[in-house]
C-alpha cells in the first residue's frame, strides 16, 4: 500500500483567492512558559486544499455537515491533462481504460500546482470544456477535484462550472497538490472538518493505491 498526499501545507503564506483573508497561525503557548504548546488558527472555509459543499453556491444545497461520510471517500481516476493545455476536454477524460461507471471521483492533474505560491497560479489555469462538463454531469460521481485555485475561470461572472456540479449534489475539491508520477487509479479520501453550516472546509486529501 502507498499513500499519496494530495494536500498543500497550510501556513501564514498560504495563497488565497483575491479578497479572501489570509490564514493566521500564531503560537499562543510554549513549553518554556506554559508547559505545553498550542497554536491559534484563523482561516476561511476555503483555504488551501479544500472542499466546496453544494451549499457554497446553491441556495438550498446541502452543507458538508449534512452529507454522509461516504461521499468523502471512493474510487478515483486521475485525469492527466497535457502541460499548459488551457482546456480540459472530454476526450482527456475518456482517454483512460477505466470505466467511468466504476469511478466515484475524477481528479484533474494539470500540473498547475507547480505555480503554487506565485501570481501565475491565479491566472489562465485550465478549466473544463462544455463537453467535459456535460460528461461529468451525466455520470453519478461523488465529486470532482482540481489542482487549481478554482473550477471556474478567475473572471467568471456566472460560476457555471461550480453551479452545475454543485447543483447535481456533487462536491468540488480545489487546490489539490497532485505529484508527478501518480497512478491513474486509487482510493481517494478527503474528509472535512466537522462544524455547523459548513459551505466548505480544508481537507487532508490522499490517494491510496
Language-model features: where?
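Active-/binding-site microenvironments in catalytic and ligand-binding cores
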Residues: 1-209
